Amino acid sequence: MKTKFVFDLLAPDDILHPSNHVNLIIRLI
């Protein structure tokens, strides 16, 4: 999954701040 890889680069602290990960996805939609 390439998108997952990109998200990991943009939000490497996804585990500590899962809300940031969700906000990135919402912005792309």
Swiss-Prot record:
<dbReference type="Pfam" id="PF06145">
    <property type="entry name" value="Corona_NS1"/>
</dbReference>
<protein>
    <recommendedName>
        <fullName>Truncated non-structural protein of 4.9 kDa</fullName>
    </recommendedName>
</protein>
<dbReference type="InterPro" id="IPR009314">
    <property type="entry name" value="Corona_NS1"/>
</dbReference>
<comment type="similarity">
    <text>Belongs to the coronaviruses ns4.9 protein family.</text>
</comment>
